[in-house]
Amino acid sequence: MNTAALREQIQRAHQHEAETGQLLQQLKIQLPHLHPAIHLPEVDAQGALTRFVTAYIDLVPDLLDAAHEVAIEAGIEGQIRPVLRIAEHFFTAPPDIMQGHEGLDSLLDEAYLAHRLVEEVNDLYIKHFGQPLIPSNTTVASVIAHQVIGEQFANQLDEAVHHAVDQLLDDEDFALDSVEAYREKLSSPDTEAAWKRWPSLSRQLGIGLELERSAG
């Protein structure tokens, strides 16, 4: 995985945002129109939403590195790597539907694609192993990102994700001998220790989850 290039791209987008304030202005416009299910702090709601979007984008390289490493341990790197490469490709060569988007605004769309792709792979792992590829539940964060991006465009991005997964993964990929060996290894005490190598995932998503927990 060439996540170093992704990190550089994200850094450039942060610089673009520092110079233009483009994302901040966009979120300011969107804030009054967000779905009522999304509860933001009464104080500095715009700042909280901006921090959430930034954390959601910044998390992608770590997420892809984690997914790749665990896929190697599972003996299914050959099946998972192409999916992760698509997530990476969403950043380096975005689909045509994202033309005209730039800076952190563009990377939010691309981060959404990457997160949703990993979520779909996680769902397959849960189906076949009873637990996800990586122990990071980004579903709540992606629901919020979906609303920030906008229903119509986010639905188009979801379609791109489903198409990618359908093309690259099926049940036969989880019937390999190496996968059976991994399934047995999941009951090992070492597995829980392995999950704990990625504590920053949930911490970085804390903003997104806090946004939801503040409801009520």
Describe these PLM feature segments.
Residues L113, D123-L124:
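Hydrophobic alpha-helical segments
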Residues M1-P82, E119, I126-G216:
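Terminal, membrane-proximal amphipathic helices
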Residues P82, I86-R116:
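Membrane-inserting effector segments that mediate pore formation, membrane fusion
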